[in-house]
Amino acid sequence: MADNDIIHTVPEMRRIRGIHFVGIGGVGMCGIAEVLANQGYAISGSDIKESPVLERLRSLGVRVDIGHRAENIDGADVVVTSTAVNTENLEVAAAHERRIPVVPRAQMLAELMRFRHGIAVAGTHGKTTTTSLTAAIMAEAGLDPTFVIGGRLNSAGTNARLGQSRYLVAEADESDASFLHLQPMSAIVTNVDADHMHTYGGDFAQLENTFIEFLHNLPFYGVAVMCVDDPVVRKLLPRVNRQVIRYGFSEDADLRAENVRQDGMVTHFRVVRAEGEPLDVSLNMPGRHNVLNALAAIAVSADEGAGDEAIIRGLNNFTGVGRRFDVQGDYHFDGGSATLVDDYGHHPREVAATIDAIREGWPGRRLAMLFQPHRYTRTQDLYEDFVEVLSGVDVLLMLEVYAAGEEPIPGADARALCRSLRKRGLEPVFVDDPDKLQGLLASQLQNGDLLVTQGAGNVGAIAKQLVAQGGGHG
């Protein structure tokens, strides 16, 4: 029997039966909860409001309570929290009082990975898509991985799945440095950029050092898959004391993309390999940034034994990830309709990648964007970059900053961005009341426009409302 055919038996976490998640509806929490529930643990959790995610968990037998109360942790042997959960939370306090272990989400993910052959995907941008593509290729190759992803994989309808092999593919989160808990066999680094700098005391060198520390969690026989097109990753390469597979458009990449051609939502390119014949592939996602994400997935999957046919099928059949260039359908308004795309990107580099993909795939169409800045600190730190990138759209409507629990910062809000953009010759429309949005869109849009809802806050929910109000898929 081949090694890939062996069902990997996961040892029980000793003495642990009941596992309680505080904030179980969070994108980083629900996937781990789902995998553990499918392994047979008694999972419970709480959150502050209902959501489709909670309904899915309940369908798996998970007990979910709305609101945080001490009695919610009854029956728990361990309590799992995320960085979004306050240490004064009633359930966390009750766990400490009862001497029940309280562990961060990343530590529980690390425990899942410890019993498997872990593939961890790190980087400031592209983690979710790269993790999803890796899982898709490995599934096509019959490797049947468990995966935990920071977004909904459209083909699976969920962000996590318990596979029957020894493989676990998961995102590695640098935002709070929690990826240092992970000890994978293989690791991808897509890029390193200035974001979540409060975690690193505003010190970029500390961020770089933390990525090196993460890579050195690999065993000496592990492999680091790194994007040499990213200047920071290239700078870090000499410090990596592990085997490295380099990927990118650069001539010195071990896995290189060339002959890139975009046809709407489909991107065609050739994979040139240091060993083996070139491979022509088609990816069901637009943009050169997604070509890089695909190269990383190809590199790590091939290293684990995925063949060319599985790679071709995995990319060609890929149906995308929720809120990652997610085409919602046609939005109808007085005067015509616009194609509505929803995208999670909230860093200037991510917004620029979305704009570039649209310009490449839909040349000649006007680009209208409804943008919601995410966090006042990010808006302040990357203010000029946001102004530069947003000035590249044809029509811009802007919502107020999604605070994510932060206090407002003077001069780092949506009105300030609008003022700065007007100096660039763009006339952005500040949306002070989302209830007025339909009327504002009707006044700004033209028939045939491409409308993007962009950001990490509740703008994704607004996109769904627009589709419902404006005629849905058509």
From Swiss-Prot:
Where the protein is mainly located, per its record?
A: cytoplasm
Q: Which GO terms describe its biological process?
A: cell division; cell wall organization; peptidoglycan biosynthetic process; regulation of cell shape
Superkingdom is Bacteria
- Assigned EC number: 6.3.2.8
- A Pfam family per the record: Mur_ligase_M
Q: Where in the cell is it found?
A: Cytoplasm
Q: Which protein are we looking at?
A: UDP-N-acetylmuramate--L-alanine ligase
Q: Please name the NCBIfam families in this protein's record.
A: murC
Question: Catalytic activity, per the record?
Answer: UDP-N-acetyl-alpha-D-muramate + L-alanine + ATP = UDP-N-acetyl-alpha-D-muramoyl-L-alanine + ADP + phosphate + H(+)
What's the stated role of this polypeptide? Cell wall formation.
Q: State the family named in the UniProt similarity comment for this chain.
A: Belongs to the MurCDEF family.
GO cellular component terms, A-Z: cytoplasm
This protein's gene is called murC
Q: Which GO terms describe its molecular function?
A: ATP binding; UDP-N-acetylmuramate-L-alanine ligase activity
What keywords were assigned to this record?
ATP-binding, Cell cycle, Cell division, Cell shape, Cell wall biogenesis/degradation, Cytoplasm, Ligase, Nucleotide-binding, Peptidoglycan synthesis
Matching SUPFAM superfamilies, A to Z? MurCD N-terminal domain, MurD-like peptide ligases, catalytic domain, MurD-like peptide ligases, peptide-binding domain
* Residues given in the record as ATP binding sites: G123, T124, H125, G126, K127, T128, T129
Q: In which pathway does it act?
A: Cell wall biogenesis; peptidoglycan biosynthesis
Write down the top EC class of this protein.
ligase
